[in-house]
């Protein structure tokens, strides 16, 4: 494409520095572009993109307050304000690893590092537009949802030995998978790999294995790819899909943690990590991931009220693990919930959830009057709701328990179990309120983990037993039987192996949680009292032995 042909193309430049906008516009004009607009912020860019179509968009990564370039690109695509053939070039003076990884992860058409010379700009523009011209019919077919036509065009380009054969192969493999042409995809990826060991082809082949239902094989393949190339983020995404298909939430969390470590500013993965941590009962990790989701997702299309509600929800769950540790996190949650409707448009259900969560946290933090007032507000809002919402009802029960109204909470739970008896999805949410799960999935999970914990306990492998009981009671924090199994394994380890500060502290904190739920009328109360007495004896003996050991060492020195 000659420079005279650039005159009809529209260009948008986004940068918060006027001098850079002017310099880049001047360079583009010199190259032959005549329709050039420039703005200083992401919000201005979105506004102008809603009104006009641009063939090329240049955006700085750091745009000051508001959206950054990565978030802008993601939102433009999310809102479908650009076509596949349009070019988005991300520019940055920040070459830190986190920024570069996040930038490449959102797949701009190119990435330029400041300062940019006129020669570099010209070379990149010519290369990008030449590729655009050759692949334009393919892009148009995809935009028109005519994927079979796009496949035919790509096959023709490959048969003609297109200079963009690698791009054609990558796109063709994706389209084969989307159109369920798995054998063709497999042949393509194997052909590519027979001549070059390319990461995208390896992941593509693993995606074929996923499509065939070979989840374990695919997961093993992807593990190898990640070990060899830990920065290739698409491998983590495919491995996450494999874990979901295998129903292995624990492994899924580990995969997402590695992905978040590789690219901390990848907002979507941080959110997915936070969600699965909450499902797994790993509330400390959930809180960290939700905070990062909120931090990095501010001003992006990932920024929504549910992230804040889930952060508050995770904070309330700390009380089911460690009462002492929970108090330090509550102030953030209260501030967040008090201001949530000032920033977002919240639905009626979200407003009720926020109020109930706020009531819980204030009750657990000792602010009984504030908690009661908030609870009454929520009750009024619930009475006006047109439809039932199981998530609202779960928080209603949690608020009752936090306020010491255990009898009322039990009545509400009993009614919920009757109403939702044929709704497994709802029952899975209710499981977290119960001493024992009632959903099919919950019973299966808890049965498997609990059995393993008991088997290890019987064989006196207390460390493994503790690991399994700890995992199970995090998933189902109100299951008192599990907590008692957990502390029994901890006590047995202390008695057999001696002083262990971590185990003693875990036992004490778990007993504090049990005390919130087990009254003298509870059938678990006698076992609780017996184990509590055993613990005090074991802890005193272990601490005495530890002091004696330390004193002997001092005398020896």
Q: Across the structure, where does each feature detected by a protein language model lie?
A:
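Conserved acidic segment of CheY-like receiver
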Residues: 6-19, 24-28
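Short hydrophobic/Thr-rich beta-strand motif most characteristic of the beta2 strand and flanking loop
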Residues: 33-41, 48
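Conserved phosphotransfer microenvironments
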Residues: 60-76, 84, 492, 503
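Alpha4 helix (beta4-alpha4-beta5 surface) of REC/receiver domains from two-component response regulators
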Residues: 70-71, 84, 94-110, 123
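C-terminal output helix
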Residues: 116-125
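CheY-like receiver
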Residues: 129-181
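Flexible loop/N-cap segments at domain edges
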Residues: 186-407, 411-413, 425-430, 441-458, ...
């Amino acid at each position: 494409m000659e420079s005279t042909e650039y005159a009809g193309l529209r260009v948008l430049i986004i940068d918060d520095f006027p001098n850079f906008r002017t310099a880049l516009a001047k360079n583009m004009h010199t190259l032959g572009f005549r329709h050039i607009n420039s703005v200083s912020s992401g919000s201005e860019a979105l506004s102008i993109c809603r009104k006009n179509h641009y063939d090329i968009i240049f955006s700085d990564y750091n745009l000051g307050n508001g959206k950054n370039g990565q978030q802008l690109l993601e939102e433009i695509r999310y809102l479908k304000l650009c076509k596949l053939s349009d070019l988005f070039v991300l520019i940055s003076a920040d070459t830190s690893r986190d920024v570069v990884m996040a930038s490449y992860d959102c797949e701009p058409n190119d990435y330029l590092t400041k300062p940019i010379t006129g020669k570099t700009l010209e070379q990149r523009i010519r290369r990008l537009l030449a590729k655009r011209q050759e692949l334009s019919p393919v892009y148009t077919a995809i935009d028109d949802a005519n994927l079979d036509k796009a496949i035919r065009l790509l096959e023709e380009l490959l048969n003609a030995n297109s200079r963009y054969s690698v791009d054609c192969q990558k796109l063709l493999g994706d389209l084969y998978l989307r159109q369920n042409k798995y054998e063709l995809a497999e042949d393509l990826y194997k052909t590519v790999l027979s001549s070059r060991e390319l990461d995208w082809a390896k992941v593509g082949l693993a995606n074929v294995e996923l499509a065939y239902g070979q989840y374990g094989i695919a997961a093993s393949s992807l593990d190898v790819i990640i070990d060899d190339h830990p920065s290739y983020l698409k491998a983590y995404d495919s491995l996450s899909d494999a874990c979901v298909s295998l129903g292995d939430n624990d492994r899924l969390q580990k995969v997402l943690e590695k992905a978040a470590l590789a690219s901390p500013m990848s907002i979507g993965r941080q959110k997915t990590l936070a969600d699965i941590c909450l499902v797994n009962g790993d509330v400390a990790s959930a809180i960290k991931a939700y905070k990062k989701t909120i931090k990095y997702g501010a001003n992006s299309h990932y920024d929504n009220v549910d992230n804040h509600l889930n952060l508050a929800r995770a904070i309330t769950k700390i009380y089911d693990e460690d009462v002492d540790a929970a108090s330090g996190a509550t102030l953030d949650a209260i501030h967040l919930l008090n201001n949530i409707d000032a920033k977002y448009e919240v639905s009626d259900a979200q407003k009720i959830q926020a109020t109930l969560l706020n009531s819980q946290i204030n009750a657990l933090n000792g602010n009984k009057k504030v908690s009661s007032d908030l609870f009454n507000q929520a009750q009024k809002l619930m009475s006006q709701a047109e439809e039932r919402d199981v998530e609202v009802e779960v928080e209603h029960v949690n608020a009752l328990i936090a306020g010491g109204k255990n009898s009322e909470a039990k009545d509400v739970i009993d009614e919920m179990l009757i109403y939702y008896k044929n709704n497994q999805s709802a029952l899975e949410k209710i499981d977290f309120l119960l001493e024992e799960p009632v959903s099919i999935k919950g019973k299966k999970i808890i049965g498997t983990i609990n059995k393993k914990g008991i088997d290890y306990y019987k064989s006196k492998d207390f460390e493994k037993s503790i690991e399994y009981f700890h995992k199970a009671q995090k998933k189902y924090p109100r299951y008192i039987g599990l907590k008692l199994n957990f502390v029994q394994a901890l006590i047995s380890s202390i008695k057999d192996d001696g002083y262990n500060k971590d185990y003693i502290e875990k036992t004490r904190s778990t007993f504090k949680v049990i005390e919130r739920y087990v009254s003298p009328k509870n059938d678990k109360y006698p076992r609780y009292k017996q184990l509590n007495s055993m613990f005090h004896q074991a802890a005193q003996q272990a601490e005495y032995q530890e002091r004696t050991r330390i004193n002997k060492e001092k005398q020896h020195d």
